[in-house]
Amino acid sequence: MISFVGMQTQEVTIKPHVKVILKSDSELLEEVVVTGYGTFKKASFTGAASTVNTSTLEDVPVLSVADKLSGNVAGVTFGSSSSNPGSVSSIRVRGMGSINAGNNPLYVIDGTPVTSGDLSEFTYSDAGTDILSSLNTNDIESITVIKDAAAASLYGSRAANGVVVITTKSGKQGKTNVSFRSDWGFSNMAIDYRPMLDGDSRRELLWTGLKNYGLYTGNMSDADAATFADQNIEDFASKPSTGWTDWKDLLFRNGSHQNYQLSVSGGNDRTKFYTSAAYTNQEGIIYKQGLERFTGNANLTHKFGDFEVQVTSQFSKVRQNKTNEATSYDGPVANYAFFQSPSSTPYNEDGTLNNGCGVFGVNPLYEREHSSDVYTLMKAFNTIKLTYNIWDKLNLSEKIAYDYAQGTNDVLWDRHSNNGAPGGVMQRIVNRNDQLNTQTQLSYINSFGLHNIDALLGFETQDTEYAFNYMAGQDYPGDLYELTNAGSTSAETNRQSYRMTSFLGRANYNYADRYYLGLSYRTDGSSRLARENRWGSFWSVSGAWRFIDESFLNPVKNVLTDGKLRMSYGVNGTQPSDYYAYMNLYKYGIIYNGQSGMSIVGIANPDLKWEKNKTWNIGLDLSFIDRISVTFDYYQRKTSDLIYDLPVSQVGGYYDGNYGYTTPQNIGSLKNSGFELTITSTNFRNKDFTWTTSLNMAHNSNKLTKLDGQQNEIVSGPLIHRVGEPYYSYYVYEYAGVDAETGKEMFYLNDGTENARKTTTNISEANKTIVGKHQASIEGGLTNNLKWKFIDLGFTFTYSLGGDAFDYSTWQHSNGGSYLYGGAVPTYYDISKMWTGPGDTNATLPKFEYGSAASLSSRWLMPTDYLRLKNLTLGVSIPQNYISKLGLSKARIYFSGSNLLTWKSKDLFVDPEMRVDGLCTFETPALRTYTFGIELNF
């Protein structure tokens, strides 16, 4: 008898030479779904969840959790405002479910909810610091994304936006295994990000603008207008003696990264262990941008008698160097890189940096030498769990988890910088997040003939404390920048905490592994709400029918090898993001008219209550000839009692400008609906060659269904939040092309009459209208994995169709002409496409004229359709007969590349995987990375 894990046992006759080919056992290899409150076979799971393929986690070297998920899970979308190493990414599961209370999913590590999001909220960089960047992705065993209420409702108020369940590696019974992994690589921009005209092309364009100014504003003759342009062009586009300056080349560089990890695992029938240590160093594509990380992880499980104890400990230290990027803060380097004129010279004749050059009067090379933004994070996540096996069907467990994170952010503008003059400014922000979780669970699993029951009761507490200290010093007498050396200092402290107490239960029943029923209930009490509204109840009911086992399908079972219909309905909730929104808040330390006092910084709303998410899902799982599997889900998600920060009058007594003049109200409703499709196939499989393919696609429709009942829209710049429309809709004048006689921009009237599609060059006659939305119509990914003998190849494409973005920054270049004439010019301003004179009917861009202001219109609306080679990995495993003599069980070398190719609209000058509202500013673009590595197992 010959057997192997995951293979069917076979009996063979004993002979001198025997050749045996074991067949896979689909039941043993069946995919499981880890929910945090239990592990289920996918065949018996009644909800909607996706699990990332184990080989994807193991073989593809990436540095973030988001990169592990990208392109592999239907219905999960990603956005980022920066590719600064360690920066925050936004992850959305089935759209957005809130306005002000947060849209990020709940992250659960080894069964415990953890702190997530941006920890460095008081810095001057758009990048932020993702607390999950402290997690070593090589320690991850599996990732499951829970999308509907069937399992998510057990997490109650924290899971309205989905749950990402991360299971870290643990020891396995068998000999001790030592694994070493190391990789190195480099990175650059994934696309030609915001290309600019070179010096000569820019000079030609500006000369044309000056001439047109003379012709159409100065009423000059053609010859006089040309002379006028010749006389003034040197003021705007003079060529330096050292040649044109390429600011993009000066401010950006190739990034690099290196990663080293050593892990040891093993165990016996009583004790299992896994431990690892890792070091990561990543340099960004902007000088002084990078991340350095040390991590340690230990997981120990020990059985004694009727007890089992499990201890996990994760520690990390992260040092993140950031650079200011967009337009909202002082010294934004990425902003400068695309605004500086090629006529500006960064260096003086003696080789020193030339301070004061450029459109903003700031030399970005000078600023970066005299400023810094460094964030240091210390994080520890420790758990201990004791399980008592009361009898073989009944278990009682108690778990305590402590999640600790402390960060220190040092921001410096020294005495020589423009922002720090004359004496320098240093700011230090120290923030701390503590979270203590306790979980008590009683679980019961039993079978009675064809009846199978899996039930759980639980009690949980969560205590969270957040504190920060802000200290600032200025007027330094020298170049030693510590707070104690400052001529003057200021400080501010804050501490806040909240508690949540929860009772929960679930029961799953199935008959003959054919008919399934699931029930769950949870009630949460949160100190973020007034006593009258403190408790919220969340529940779900789900069912499934595994119809493949019905006799009437016997004739087609040779083709249809599995089939299951699923349905679920449930209610989740979201609590306010503010800890004390229901209370009146005051702040001391305010100076008014030379007297100390206090100010109002929060207006109470004791009626504030939970947001409610009501979700239903219907799904179908099919398998054909044991090679092709299809999963289809349709869902509808309605959010009511939306928490919205309603503006209030400042006359009421608000004094401190650091706090918004708003009060939270439950005033709105949102609706998300859509479908998800995943098709997985084993295209070919024999003893030497295997080829599998997975395709996923998703559509989500998001609409705002209610505001406060009195107004039906809120306008914010080019965005509008209007009832009946997607939340991120663009509301501007509709561009109608170029007037052939005057060369001016034309706009559609959109006045609601029969003249709506008539055009005008007078923008005051036109009306704004919704011209697009950021939400894509279809998004998804395509993954192929091939293995031939000792060579493996995997690649993933991601794609998106039907969305729009608003290129705010290209419009800024044209605003009043001042940026164009003082700084850089985007290649968008193609002189060959511009109006040349009366009767020009071929122009797609209006007349270019000095001082002319371009209007905020759909001219700046760009399609976000794209297809991207998200990842490609090629590995070679050295055959066992070569490495066994060296004491190795595995030796693999590999190459991996991410964002290698991107196909997108030529009109989109930024990366298509952008921030969630689609407003394009100046961020560090997505990176194309090349990684070379080696993996050794002993």
Feature roles, as predicted:
Residues 1-297, 303, 308-310, 314, ...:
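Short, small/polar-rich motifs associated with maturation and membrane association
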Residues 75, 85, 274, 788-808:
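Glycine-rich phosphate/pyrophosphate-binding loops
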Residues 77-81, 153, 548-556, 882-884:
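Active-site phosphate-binding and catalytic loops of NTP-dependent enzymes
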Residues 103-104, 109, 173-244, 284-291, ...:
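Surface-exposed loop/interface segments of Gram-negative outer-membrane beta-barrel transport/assembly proteins
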Residues 168, 180, 262-266, 296-302, ...:
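Residues on the lipid-exposed face of transmembrane beta-strands in outer-membrane beta-barrel proteins
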Residues 182, 277-283, 517-526, 683:
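Transmembrane beta-strand segments that form the barrel wall of outer-membrane beta-barrel proteins
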Residues 263, 692, 773-801, 854-903, ...:
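Conserved C-terminal beta-signal and adjacent last beta-strands/turns
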Residues 270-273, 306-309, 393-396, 450-453, ...:
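Repeated loop/turn-to-beta-strand initiation elements of outer-membrane beta-barrel proteins
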